[in-house]
Design a protein with these regions (language model features):
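Short cytoplasmic-facing helical segments at TM-TM junctions of multi-pass membrane proteins
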Residues: 179-225, 501-549, 573
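Glycine-rich helix-loop "coupling/hinge" segments at transmembrane-helix boundaries
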Residues: 158, 187, 230-273, 289, ...
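C-terminal transmembrane helix and the adjacent membrane-cytosol boundary/short C-terminal tail
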Residues: 188, 264-323, 545, 584-619
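Generic hydrophobic transmembrane alpha-helix motif, especially the helices
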Residues: 108-111, 115-122, 128, 138-175, ...
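Interfacial loop/helix-cap signal at membrane boundaries in integral membrane proteins
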Residues: 1-64, 334-385
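Transmembrane alpha-helices
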Residues: 113, 169, 173, 205-238, ...
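Transmembrane-helix boundary motif in ABC transporter permease subunits
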Residues: 70-75, 89-103, 112-141, 392-402, ...
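Hydrophobic, membrane-inserted alpha-helices
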Residues: 65-72, 87-90, 151-155, 215, ...
């Protein structure tokens, strides 16, 4: 068995144990620091002394002090609006009884994000300095970013066991690639004049890197940090399958018990934390650094001093309040059973929707399954392997030539030669339907809002908001509307994947030169004619890149749909979690199949977009 194989290799076993213990120590230390406990005290005193003095514990950070801290940090980064977002968000999490699981989730993020940052920055710098390294990194990053998250869990369980450390390792593997890409992109964008100025100033290579290049690429690098944080929060539910504590585990337990109200509360907390961290990190990335300000010590650190003072004051008040509370000190933490809740209202709303619209929803579900999805599924499963390979290679040849055709054909042949071809076809059919619907939705919505500058800003802000949602959250509303069917998964995938299609449509239409708009108007074309004959053709290469992103988003959601029951590759990946002997190999292989599907589409679409841009004179 695979576990015995690892047991035989003492050095490898000790290596994985060391990593697990190190990560677990860091996560536990941060949680104890914020939530209180005796483990930090235990480091400095003996167990016997601690047993005799059980009153000696590390005090928890009062939620009141944390709320003030979030308000002050938001004010420092973005003014009163961001301050209110941080303060009200922290207040909501606290009084609704989700303070402890939220801190458990944040401790998870606080440990994984710096590790991802260091790894991503290091590999990004290496790739920037050495073109061969960058060339080698690109296919690896492509596979890592398109492989389903579940595929990583099985080998991580085999190597590192279960617990918070296993969830953090999975998150590090998934969240590091975007940091590498953003670092390389930011360093490449630096103009040669900046590099020459640094060299002319007498900088060594190290000084040039750390005092010129990295500060100049600061915005792109911090955008990478933002992406890393969003990936970490998107993983909190999936990490709960390998033992990670926090809001993700609460959400998973609530869904398993079909407690939609409790699941919605936990999901809303995850979304709220994601929105706050997203806005904070974006404000940090966009904040201009004043290198010439001449401020006193108090002026420079006044908010930090106020925060430190507030922690001291609220901690003293909370400590004194221990004498007034019998069992639970509500100034430290409000337990979930004592906090406010709107779960019963959500449950009542779900019951009302189900009772009122049962026949409509059921009829729509049956129609979609029997008249659309069923025939489409049969058509995919009935198509011969040779015909499928010929079709995909033919499309690739027409768009990109013999090299693209052979590359795409090789990837599809790798899938076809396995015994999972039928499951791959089911995945393809679900992804195809969702991509078509999401692309149409995105193009229509993006085209409507892109007509004015104000509309573009509004819809891009909406896209930013929805992109902060962890993917698992999209499954919550569709489960109670359509039960556990392919319809639920596909609707969640369509909503999730509409965001990139909308964003790229707006970007593409806004990139059309104003002079062409005016030329069309002067030629006497109507508004519809200008949109169909000028704007859409010129924006279509960019729109197709959005469709490319839609494919990746759709595949991720379709695989995630295995949690509520599907028959595709995702179900097999999910099932591999319980197979000790061959589970890791099966999960990685199936995850690679999904990755190859996404990469095949990416190769074809990007090649077409490049050729189309050249033909239109946009490249």
């Amino acid at each position: 068995p695979i576990f015995e194989m690892y047991e035989e290799k003492a050095a490898f076993r000790e290596f994985t144990k060391s990593i697990s213990k190190g990560l677990l120590f860091l996560i536990t230390f941060v949680r104890e620091l914020l939530l209180g406990g005796d483990k930090i005290i235990d480091v400095f005193v003996s167990d016997a002394w601690l047993k005799d003095n059980d009153w000696m514990t590390w005090p928890a950070l009062p939620w009141t002090a944390a709320t003030v801290g979030a308000f002050l940090l938001g004010f420092q980064l973005g003014g009163i609006r961001l301050a209110l977002l941080g303060g009200i968000g922290s207040l909501y999490v606290s009084i609704f009884g989700n303070w402890v699981p939220s801190i458990q989730t944040l401790s998870f993020v606080l440990i994984t994000t710096p590790i991802c940052f260091v790894l991503g920055l290091s590999f990004g710098i290496w790739g920037y300095l050495d073109r061969k390294v960058e060339t080698a990194l690109q296919p690896v990053l492509n596979v890592m970013q398109t492989m389903p998250q579940f595929a990583y869990l099985v080998p991580i369980i085999a190597l590192f066991g279960l617990g918070d450390h296993a969830g953090s390792i999975a998150t590090i593997v998934i969240a590091t690639p975007p940091m590498i890409r953003n670092t390389i992109l930011g360093l490449k964008r630096i103009s040669p004049e900046v590099v020459e100025a640094g060299l002319m100033s007498g900088c060594t290579k190290t000084q040039l890197l750390f005092k010129v290049l990295i500060p100049t690429a600061r915005r792109d690098i911090l955008n990478g940090v933002n992406t890393v944080i969003m990936q970490c929060l998107a993983m909190v539910v999936i990490a709960s399958f390998v033992g990670a504590k926090g809001l993700g585990l609460n959400l998973k337990i609530a869904l398993n018990s079909l407690k939609i109200g409790k699941a919605a509360e936990a999901g809303f907390c995850i979304v709220l934390i994601a929105v706050i961290l997203d806005r904070f990190t974006k404000a940090w990335a966009n904040k201009q650094v004043d290198y010439f300000e001449n401020l006193t010590f108090f002026q420079r650190y006044k908010l930090l001093i106020i925060f430190g003072t507030s922690i001291l004051i609220f901690s003293i008040i909370a400590f004194i309040a221990n004498g007034y509370f019998d069992k639970i000190n509500y100034l430290y933490v409000i337990p979930i059973e004592k906090g406010f809740t709107f779960a019963h209202y959500i449950d009542a709303a779900v019951d009302w929707v189900w009772e009122t619209f049962f026949y409509s929803l059921n009829s729509f579900n049956k129609f979609l399954l029997t008249e659309v999805l069923g025939p489409m599924k049969k058509a995919y499963l009935g198509m011969p392997v040779v015909a499928t390979l010929t079709l995909t290679m033919g499309v690739a040849y027409i768009i990109g030539g013999i090299r693209t055709s052979l590359l795409v054909g090789g990837m599809m042949l790798f899938i076809a030669m396995s015994k999972y071809w039928d499951r791959a076809l089911i995945t393809m059919y679900m992804a195809t339907f969702a991509v078509i619907m999401a692309s149409l939705n995105g193009i229509i919505v993006g085209s409507i809002f892109a007509q004015t500058e104000r509309g573009s800003k509004i819809i891009l802000s909406v896209c930013d908001f929805f992109e902060t949602f962890p993917s698992f959250v999209y499954l919550i509303p569709v489960i109670f509307l359509f039960n556990i069917t392919d319809t639920s998964v596909l609707i969640a995938a369509i909503v999730y994947a509409t965001v990139p299609a909308t964003r790229y449509t707006v970007w593409g239409l806004n990139s059309v030169p104003l002079s062409l708009h005016e030329a069309g108007t002067m030629s006497g074309v109507s508004r519809i004619q200008r949109w169909t004959n000028i704007e859409i053709p010129l924006a279509f290469p960019t729109i197709m890149l959005g469709v490319n992103q839609t494919v990746v988003f759709t595949l991720q959601m379709v695989i995630l749909g295995a949690l509520i029951g599907t028959e595709d590759l995702g179900q097999l990946i999910f099932g591999a979690l319980s197979r000790a002997q061959d589970g890791p190999g099966v999960a990685i292989t199936l995850g690679l199949f999904v990755s190859l599907m996404a990469i095949s589409v990416d190769v074809i679409v990007r090649k077409w977009a490049e050729e189309r841009k050249k033909a239109l004179g946009l490249a």
